[in-house]
Each structure stands twice: as C-alpha cells, then as structure tokens.
Amino acid sequence: MTNSIARIGRTYRFESAHFLPKVPDGHKCRNLHGHNYRIDIVVRGALDARGFVKDFSEIDALVAPLLLQLDHRLLNEVEGLENPTAEIIARWFLERIADCESVRVYENDECWAEVSR
C-alpha cells in the first residue's frame, strides 16, 4: 500500500443574516439581508486503519457546534465575523476545523468564496 493522501468533502447548510459595514454607502450589501448559505468542507490526510481520512461523523462533530453559532443569527454579532464577507466566513470555518484543507462558502448558486491552507 502506498502512502497516498486523500481528500474528502462534506456539505452543510445554514441560514443567517448579515450586512457588510466596510462597503460604501449605497452598496446593496451594506443593508441587512440574509442568505441560505451552503458550505463545502474539504479534509485531507493519509488513510487510517479503517481506510478513512476521517469518518464523516467526525467532521459532523467538528462542524455542528460552529453551525449552531451561525444558524438563524446575525453574523455581524459573532466574534470574528464583524465584517462577514463570504471570504471571511470561509476563513472563520477553516481556522476552527482540524485537518481542514479548504472551505467554500456559497451565498447563492452563483456566488462563492473559497479559502485554503
């Protein structure tokens, strides 16, 4: 067996409101609005004795408490998300999930941001 590295991903969803305080007056995102966010979490590593990088339930256990902080909340009130752009939300997740290689945050079907290590 080779020492290969594998990547796995899991998708989550949450709904939140936010506004972007650092955009100019008149910009539509300066106003309070909401999104049905989708996030893709990618984890990488060597396969363990079970043949997993991680069991998906292990990723769920890491992500669930983070989603509880964001779901149906005003993101601007969450520490680290005072200016909650999609890029900053992705970074917020990346910094809090062990072994995470990348996080992609979708604000809608057409717009996303990705942050990686």
Where are these regions (language model features)?
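Charge-rich, low-complexity N-terminal segments
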Residues: 1-117
